Curated annotation (Swiss-Prot):
It is found in: Plastid, Chloroplast. Belongs to the universal ribosomal protein uS14 family. Its main location: plastid. It comes from the Eukaryota. Binds 16S rRNA, required for the assembly of 30S particles. One of its GO terms (biological process) is translation. The gene is rps14. Pfam families: Ribosomal_S14. Keywords: Chloroplast, Plastid, Ribonucleoprotein, Ribosomal protein, RNA-binding, rRNA-binding. The lineage of its organism: Eukaryota, Viridiplantae, Streptophyta, Embryophyta, Tracheophyta. GO terms for cellular component: chloroplast; small ribosomal subunit. This is Small ribosomal subunit protein uS14c. GO terms for molecular function: rRNA binding; structural constituent of ribosome. It comes from Lotus japonicus (Lotus corniculatus var. japonicus).
Length: 100
């Protein structure tokens, strides 16, 4: 189980990303449309003034049951370890153990 402070930090980043998403997207569109370099620098300054944790690249996918940041499966939202345990206990419908 991940430390609770790390999980809370990640939730805070998600909230910030959602809050500033439209501002960031519109500023990036403006930069591509504006021809003059000085105006591009002004718009870029606006982007830099946004909180660092509001950038989507700062987000990290975590397992929703344990909070583990590594080996996550997007389809399930689980880490590999938790996914394996749940498949063995038949808690995930449609998932089967591989055998060859």
């Amino acid at each position: 189980m991940a430390r609770k402070s790390l999980i809370q930090r990640e939730k805070k980043r998600q909230k910030l990303e959602q809050k500033y998403h439209l501002i960031r997207r519109s500023s990036k569109k403006e930069i591509s449309k504006v021809p003059s370099l000085s105006e591009k620098w002004k718009i870029h300054g606006k982007l830099e003034s946004l909180p660092r944790n509001s950038a989507p690249t700062r987000l990290h996918r975590r397992c929703f049951s344990t909070g583990r940041p590594r080996a996550n499966y997007r389809d399930f939202g689980l880490s590999g370890h938790t996914l394996r345990e749940m498949v063995h206990e038949c808690l995930l419908p449609g998932a089967t153990r591989s055998s060859w």
